[in-house]
Amino acid sequence: MAQDQPLLAVQEVLRKCFPVVEQQQGLWQSTLQDCSPLLSSLSNLAEQLQAAQNVRFEDVPALRPFPDLQERLRRKQLEAGDIALDKLTDRLATLLRVRDTVSSHVERVFQTYEQHSAALDMDAILRPSVVSPSVADMLEWLQDIDRHYRSSYP
């Protein structure tokens, strides 16, 4: 029984890690979805700013009574852009937190594995059970998952 303890310790930390990874993946996906309309908004604002710069407001008779209209419009567009950028900055912070949360859980799994590696039976590590994949496969998956998040936002 004592020889099973190292394997059980690694399996337990794996069992705790995967639900966290799944929850963080959901947060990652929803955050990325939140970014799409913000990026569209920024793109539209950039087009509007460019179009407004190409118009000579003083040459349009209907706009002459509003001498500061071009500057007010520009200011409003820039303010709207700043708001969208602030929201995107918040989303980026969320993505970085997801990356860090996943990495810390993966690191914990590998620390536990390394802590018990000398006592682990290699056959047991490589052997899947009826209800779960092998520990080696799960460790490889976690490395791939961690690499994905780290390469997305280094």
Predicted feature descriptions by range:
Residues 1-154:
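Long alpha-helical rod scaffolds of large eukaryotic non-enzymatic complex subunits
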